[in-house]
Amino acid sequence: MDGDALFPRVDAVADSFTAEYRKGALTDSAQLGRLRDRLKTLEDSARQYAVSNELDRILTENGAQNLNASTGNDATNYFFSLPSNRAKLWFVLESDRIRNPVLREFYSEREVVLEERRLRVETQPFGMLLEEYLAAAFRAHPYGRPVVGVASEIQTVDRQAAQEYFKRFYGPNNAVVAIVGDIDVDSMKAWATRYFADIPTGEPHRPVVTQEPPQRGERRIDVEYDANPQVLIGYHVPSARHPDAQALAVLSQILTGGRTSRLFQRLVIRDRVATTIASFQFPGSLYPRLFTFQGVPIAPHTTQEIETAVYEELARLTREPPTDEELQRVRNQIEASAVQRLASSFGVAFQLSNSEALWYDWTQTFRDQAAQSRVTAADVQRVARAYFDRGNRTVATLVRPPKPATGGTN
């Protein structure tokens, strides 16, 4: 862990801690892919001398709030807030959690992850559609694998495999820690050295070498589920570090960013075709990803009407540049979003740790915001022409299954 970029925020009475590990779904092999989900739910069992939920109890008794964890394709995060005079407690507990992982409740937590998959994917229309969509779009790259895994993987991984996985990746060399609040920088550095310096390093994060081959034609899938229809439309685009990434972010805001955006005005306000129209780049940032549109029609309107509107507005951007008013609106949105993210200690900590973990540079997030503000109309047109063609497109539609034929007797 690097302590060279510690800055106090003296207006905060509590400290927000985020620990982000450079390992996400892309670090996982097919067999070990779901271990990180169980590991993050086993925090309260990872101390040899602890009873059930002991870590949670200690933190709560010392005033901790907002204890949570998240995991994605690129990284795994742990975060909570502590009173400023309890900051040392984080170093004590986190270092012991890494040094002495005892996964006492592994098998019960395995059932928790299975249930999480059932709730978020197998019985949730959007989750099911999203999983099939990513599998269709990514034939080679691990971004096509579900973050929560598949049931057969979850059911067959044992505690020994989890222990080995933990030792491989949960080391100080893979951790980025952001501490924001009324802190003493010298104390933070001293505690980091005292509690983490003698912990063995884990296996260093290695980039994924598999590259998704160019798509050679539109891909379409129908996902049958008894729910209201919706559609995902995706185009392969570069990673968040590519020079075009910021222009693509601005294009997204022009089309779906807020009530005054083009597609929202057309589909939701004017024509009343859809309840939802959104766009986003995912499922990660480190590698080439998907620029995705999500649309949910209002009956009796159809997903095809949403598709038509999306394609027409993309084509319009290639012919007609966005107006100065649209670009200024996007700049205002970028600035407002940046202010909101930095309004709390947690927001600052999460943003800094995420930027350092992914890009090895905690200032990158601020440079990205500045770059978005410099995007021109010509930049937006250029990326609209470069990426949004039919051959680069994957479309996944949620459809109701056909009703079974009814028989009769004469």
Residue ranges of model-derived segments:
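Extracytoplasmic/secreted cell-surface and envelope-processing proteins
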Residues: V185-K189, P243, T303-E305, R393, ...
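A common structural junction motif
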Residues: D96-L103, Y195-E203, Y311-P322
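Non-catalytic beta-strand/loop surface segments
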Residues: G3-N85, L119-P172, D198-H242, Q253-T302, ...
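Short beta-strands and strand-coil junctions in structured, solvent-facing domains, enriched
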Residues: N100, V185-D186, P238-H242, P300-T303, ...
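Solvent-exposed, non-transmembrane alpha-helical starts
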Residues: K88-W90, Y107, T123, A190, ...
